[in-house]
Amino acid sequence: MKRFFIAVVIILNCSFTSANAAVMKNTKPLIELTYSKSDQVSSVALTPVSIIISGTTESPSSAWINGALAGSSDGFIASYSSLGAPLWNIRLGNTANEIATSLAIDLDGSIWVAGASSALLTPNPTTPPVKALNPDNVILDPSVPISTPLNRIKIWQISSTGNLLNTFEYVGENIIYPKKILVTETNLIVLGNIYDKSSVGAFYISASKTGLFTPIIKYGSKSTQINSAISNKDGSITAVGSSGELLLKVKPLSKVDAVTLKISSSGVLQQVARATLKSTTRSWGSIGAGLLQGGRVNYSNKTEAAITKFSALGKPVWNVRYLAKSSALVASGNTSWATYTSSGVIKGVPAWKPKSPTPVLIEFGKKGEVISSHTLTSPAVALAVNNEIGTVVITDSGVAFGLVVVNQ
């Protein structure tokens, strides 16, 4: 009788485990947006009825971006319905080189896009010597424009119907790479990185909605980067990235730590929280509402995708790490979502044993348990969630961007 009771308990436990385990489902893009050069989608944002993407194109022409390439690269923004139908698009470029790296939707429905641009400089003409040899009578052109590095922060304002409303510019000294634009009631805040030879430092800059910029504020100067950020209810900012140098008298714990920075609304660095593991380099690559953070851990012989939910700066509620070939992108809604390229088992998805690295999308509950899991046809480059549309993933196969929607 005792053995029978134990057997029944084991069977019931196995039944509950199987019932609670997530099953990996396959997804397919609603549409695919083809390209021919090194194009990128950098950001996605959602309205109750539309999906808006922004990025950079180097393709000479495009079936889904109006107009032809002006410089070596143009920024772009495009809007689609929740079913993948094209609504509008606009090319953000002129004869200089532009990139578009982040977008945010304002309360009035207009869209702000941050990026960077170069400038075209015309060199001073020089008069060739009178006796210069020119047997073929070649016509000399001394005024071929020269492109500067991407040292200008660019901000574009676009209406909800796809009309360009304003363009603002801040000229810097070195190569500059905006990573995130945040919108408040009165201001725009751009965070990112500044490159000087072999060093990199993070930056903060604010602008009014009429294009008046404050002085730029820098954090670190050797090996500090900001990759993403969110606005907090008190007006402060939580930014995530990596650093291998002293910040606010907080020393690095390894060669490169994942860092979370609390920054005041005026750009003052207030707190620094570092995450590290022995003999690793770490970085946070994204952050969602409610302090859901995603990144990567690099060991000498493997890489892990890291996903952590915090209650406050440096105070984790739950965290998971999975064998991976990429960093983790995260987004928050009623639940927590993460996407990465999986190269190993996933706790909570017992049948998942990939034979080769495979992009996946995972949904987590309040305690970090896996609720649902999905495969993607290509690696994800952008992720967003809202209640009306669901979870939206932009994938990149190397020849086309895919628009994937998972309804909650």
Residue ranges and their predicted role:
Residues M1-F4:
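Positively charged n-region of N-terminal signal peptides that target proteins for export
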Residues I6-S15:
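Bacterial N-terminal signal peptides
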Residues N20-Q408:
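A sequence-level/structural motif corresponding to short, flexible coil/turn segments enriched
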